[in-house]
């Protein structure tokens, strides 16, 4: 078995964000299942993962909130990574914290829904349009696995993500 050589601070932040992305499938897509694909490049220390579903998509999900009933698909993509943007079923923190992880340790962060893909690098947002329609949502993230980050910044200091990770994944004698 090959183990991924990954900086603990990246794991601590990634575990929180990965859970949030998976929870988005169950909470917001109107589907019970999604798909996860991962790839690790040990030579370049890059972990890639994709989470996809064939649910209602980001625009339809956000439009369940009265505040976003007239939102367009590109607008939905651009605001879904902002803090507290939600369809009313969540806190609006999962994709926001994932965007912070991408800023701290990421190479690529993309969200696809409907006919649009949004690529986020640093503070630049780029849209690709005229794509074939994707029923649902795809979240794709590439991370540096050898870069030390501050996991608390990824969650905007709202939760003790380090303690959560350690309690969930480490034995007491490993601390």
Which stretches of residues belong to each language-model region?
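N-terminal assembly/transducer modules of large multi-domain enzymes
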Residues: 140-175
